[in-house]
Amino acid sequence: MSRSRWPLAAALLVLTALAARVPLHAAVVSAWAVGDGEKIFRYQDDSPLKQRNSVWDGSTVRLKGLYNEVLAFQVIVEADGLGARAVEVAVEPPVHAASGKAIGAPGPPLYGPGGTIEVFSEHYIRVRRPTQPLWFYGSEASAPKRMTGWIPSVLIPPDARAGRGGFPIDIPPTSEEVNRRQNTLEVIPAATRQNQGFWVDLHLPRDRSCPAGLYQGRVKVYEAGRTVAEIKLEVTLLPHYLPDENHSNIWLYGSVGVVNDYFPELSREEAERMLKFESHRHRIDLVGGSAAHTSVFDERMMEDYKPYVDGSAFTPEAGYSGPGQGCGERLFTVGCYGSITNRAMADEASTRRESDLWVQWFEANAPGVVYFWYMIDEPGPVQFPWIKEHAGWVHDNPGPGKRLPVFTTREYTEELAEDIDIWAGGRGVNLEQLPALKSQGRDHWFYNGRRPRYGAVILEAEAVDFRVNAWVKYLYGVSTWFLWEGTHWQHNFQGPKGHLHQRVFTEPLTFISWSMNWANGDGVVLYPGRMPFYPEEDRGLNRLLGSIRLKNMRRGQQDYEIMWLAEQKAGRDKVLEIIRSVVPRGLNEVGLDEPVPWSERGDDYDLAREKLLGLLGK
């Protein structure tokens, strides 16, 4: 085409676009809100939640919570097919009309007494090949409803590197739009809308200087520096306090050594503190990846670790603020994943000597902590004679070491009934044996994720998969959920890529075996703010990044505390009646080939939570 014909072609393009009412420039077209229990995919334009949901009536976000609780919601910004430039979301602190007090006033300290507001951009990971029903869900009948597409996962702080989630962010054109624009003469059809989620954490006050009652604020959406949408925000602060102490446990493993590799500017001690602080703020015990958990007993090492179990590490004086302030970790694993079994506890004499030392230290320094010897991981029948021998060395110990509980990741097995003190089943919990085990001072936990019995731990899981496990724990009186890994940034050694670091921001696959068993997102609930191995993915932050999965783990833990408070007021039966309206069955009451019996909608949990709050009274 000659240059003289370009103006005519351009004019025809403009007229055609105007007739179709399609913008010729990138633009935000709308914004709406949804709770923390949903995942809105990037190209999902048919969600009924857009019109109304548990926190959104079409114009206002309404939240309700307790002192010391963290509330969360998402702002979904819709852009046309051309995308949008320089988009960001800001939250004006909600103000109490009578007192003028504000929740989340800007400024330090983080998670301070008056509350804090944090806003993150949501990073999407594309899944083309779904996780197979191996360890993650029992059968196709229990699979998540949507398993492919651009799934929101990582939550990126505003001060991240430009172009890597830092504010403001550009919403790129849809892939279809890019293809169309390769030919300048092609008429642009109606643009495909796309979503960009922003996550908001609202930390409610820790003290009573902010009065209970209604607080009002606004959420603003900016595009290229101008306001393009406003959403009203109302927060009702109830006159009750969410305990700092957790009455149920999430045990998450995270490797200090691996994390330290990604943050070369930090010392090992700084990397460990970063891991501990971030997990503690989400009401999780990140235990097992420190030197204290993988080494033989060492008095000096345990004295260095002691602040994490007595709570002094989680105080403002130690640099910590937020939920769980002053509360220590509730769990400690001796020799995580069997790391000292064949070293310090390889024969009878050394096992008795080592177990004596551990028991004496904990009884003197941390008597409230549940400590145990992680003897072996996921044993099969061939290891049973070996387990009996090693467990006998502990249980027959004439010294204090006989009180060291023996732990393994296996569902209760009659043949080992006298040998194992704490079980963690990957297929659930033997509910028939649980009362008897507890009466003997033993226990049975559940391990990782297994739909339909409890939530899956894969990227394609619903947001509430990580929330429902706390409800299952309360329903059946299970104390602990153990998740095998939260910082699985290097491929597992059982597979062909064990020597490689993962592209956790772009590749969904995080677990692969030699037999090509796939798992998307397994083992990753925390993400690295630095990426020395793939610099193009580096966010430029010397701290950990959260995820929607991590936030729903916290939401579940907070739900459990509300259940605990409600039980003190109204009794367990009334609490169970509300829980069963959402989670009628779980664990081994559900066959692995059944559909999921519990709700997969965040709204249902929110409405049940509202009823639980009602039991607390005014």
Residue ranges: model-predicted function:
Residues A9-P23:
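Bacterial N-terminal signal peptides
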Residues A27-S54, G81-D201, R206-R208:
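Surface-exposed binding patches on compact interaction domains or structured appendages
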Residues K64, I76-V95, L185-H247:
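Extended acidic/polar, glycine-enriched regions
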Residues V75, V219, W373, K473:
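Conserved, mostly hydrophobic/aromatic
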Residues P205-S209, V256-S267, S290, T294-V296, ...:
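The substrate-binding groove and active-site-proximal loops of carbohydrate-active enzymes
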Residues V228-T341, E363-F372:
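An acidic-aromatic substrate-binding cleft motif
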Residues E317, G324, C336-D347, T351-V382, ...:
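Catalytic domains of carbohydrate-active enzymes that cleave complex glycans
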Residues A417-W518:
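Catalytic-core region of carbohydrate-active enzymes that cleave or remodel glycosidic bonds
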